[in-house]
Amino acid sequence: MRIAQIAPLYEAVPPKLYGGTERVVSYLTEALVELGHDVTLFASGDSVTSARLEAAWPRALRLDPSVRDSMAPHMRLLEQVARVAHEFDVLHFHLDYLPFPLMSRLDTPYVTTLHGRLDLPELQPVFDAFPDSPVVSISNNQRKPLPQAAWAGTVYHGLPDTLLTPQPDVKPEYLAFLGRICPEKRVDTAIRIAAQSGLPLKIAAKVDKADADYFKEVIEPLLDQAHVEFIGEINEAQKPAFLSGAKALLFPIDWPEPFGLVMIEA
């Protein structure tokens, strides 16, 4: 099949460090190529893939300080896809609801995997307006707020079975927090849990620009405690040792998590 994978432009595919959606897009794209499909990946220009890469922006938006309006590059991306949509058997979007107005007016089959939370009230009229746009959930629980959507199925996230190899020689000595620092991930709760358990906590997490004030005002003052070590972002190669050295992963979320990729990594 001639398949187009359309990724968000916030991170490279795969991400250099943190990034859930873009990593899943990479795993799926590489697997489809291995199966013999003709795959084109629409993504940032610093992406690395065995598929054909169509760069919709020179580099990941998070690494491009010149971009202040992230919607503008994504509008360019959609136009880029629209111009060649007829060349594909199917288009697979990972851009939430952004492609709905465009694709509802084109003839090429398409599907959108929804990677984010769906309980926000403002999403209801969007999905009411596009009742025939086919969508895929990443867990059955994720889709509950939008029963009216055109659900094509649920496809859980997965990982390559050789991606993370446990390191039995590493002695587990600490609790781990892995992911992103933002209010809904509740790293502050993880710090309290570690203190109450008497175990040290290592935090491997990124801080987005949108969460910089939250980090500085709420989280940074908590990092002075003796049992807390803030590592920052880590890449795929660093994860096996980080997770193997942990007695447990703390995941004290305070939001309707669509899936939770870090849990299956652990």
Name each region found by the language model.
Residues 1-265:
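Catalytic cores of nucleotide-sugar-dependent glycosyltransferases that transfer UDP/GDP/TDP-activated
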